[in-house]
């Protein structure tokens, strides 16, 4: 069975975009792949966090250092996340080294488990491609060690956009919260956000990301949550106004969120989540230690007895 790996940062509240683009697909992927999903808590330290346990699998950080020695400053400075942060800096602000070196740790997160595929949004594809480059560079220098992972970009739903500004991605860091649906928020509030989502003035429902980004984004959300294709939705809503379309979509979103709330409340009882995390950490730690030991033998830093 092929192996798939993905991680989620534990910062901010989970959005509908996170759910559609990453969490929901994990459920279907686990039937087809050996899934490894981790909480990227070391990545969260690029912004201040309350002190707590650093990580269950510290081997990520160790491998991140080794791989960081094989990546150039030019490669790191070309990463979209760094460029985006740099472009938004105010005069008295600076970027921490953690943001600049972020891709090195991401390379380690990926390569330490030898995945065949890494599901990513279009905006994260660059990071997976860098991981492939570094893996190939390491393999050429020290002999075959890492698999070259393939980025898996979903055709639909990989990038859910802001409801108030559909030219930018729905983000946990949305300052107003008006364009972002948080999956554990009050369901009626989320429905109202769908009803007030920005569209356009021609009141025609069809998919055209360039000219109709708002309605195209809503069609994507509707399609993913209902299981109905975008083409089928467009045909069904021919001659129907945006108001009815949004009302129907709000019900679909509300029903999906209700299922999430029910499941969340069910598994949030007792020690169920801690048990799953601990069992997963034990398995991941074994795999990571094995790979790290192999890397250290290759680069010659193991202590000879």
Task: List the model feature ranges, each with a label.
Residues 1-2, 305:
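Short, Lys/Arg-enriched, disordered terminal segments
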Residues 16-18, 126, 132-305:
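Conserved nucleotide- and phosphate/pyrophosphate-binding catalytic cores
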Residues 63-65, 78-84, 91-166:
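Classical nucleotidyltransferase
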Residues 49, 119-122, 206, 237:
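Conserved aromatic-histidine-acidic binding/catalytic patches
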């Amino acid at each position: 069975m092929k192996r798939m790996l993905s991680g989620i940062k534990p910062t901010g509240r989970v959005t509908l975009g996170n759910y559609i683009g990453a969490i929901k697909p994990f459920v279907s992927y686990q039937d087809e792949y050996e899934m490894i999903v981790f909480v990227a808590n070391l990545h969260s330290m690029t912004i201040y966090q309350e002190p707590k346990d650093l990580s269950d699998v510290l081997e990520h950080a160790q491998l991140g250092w080794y791989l960081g020695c094989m990546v150039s400053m030019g490669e790191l400075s070309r990463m979209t996340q760094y460029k985006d942060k740099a472009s938004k800096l105010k005069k008295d602000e600076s970027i921490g080294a953690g943001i600049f070196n972020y891709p090195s740790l991401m390379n380690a997160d990926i390569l330490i488990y030898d995945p065949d595929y890494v599901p990513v949004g279009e905006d994260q594809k660059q990071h997976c491609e860098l991981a492939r480059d570094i893996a190939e560079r390491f393999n050429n220098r020290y002999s075959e060690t890492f698999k070259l992972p393939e980025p898996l970009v979903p055709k639909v739903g990989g990038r859910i956009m802001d409801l108030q500004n559909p030219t930018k991605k729905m983000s946990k860091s949305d300052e107003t919260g008006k364009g972002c649906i948080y999956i554990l928020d009050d369901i009626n509030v989320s429905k109202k956000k769908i009803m007030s989502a920005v569209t356009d003035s021609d009141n025609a429902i069809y998919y055209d990301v360039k000219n109709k980004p708002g309605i195209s984004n809503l069609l994507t959300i509707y399609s993913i949550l209902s299981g109905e294709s975008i083409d089928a939705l467009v045909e069904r809503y021919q001659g129907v106004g945006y108001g009815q379309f949004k009302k129907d979509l709000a019900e679909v979103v509300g029903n999906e969120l209700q299922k999430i709330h029910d499941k969340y409340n069910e598994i949030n009882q007792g020690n169920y989540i801690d048990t799953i995390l601990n069992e997963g950490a034990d398995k991941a730690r074994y795999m990571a230690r094995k790979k790290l030991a192999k890397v250290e033998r290759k680069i010659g830093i193991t202590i000879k007895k």
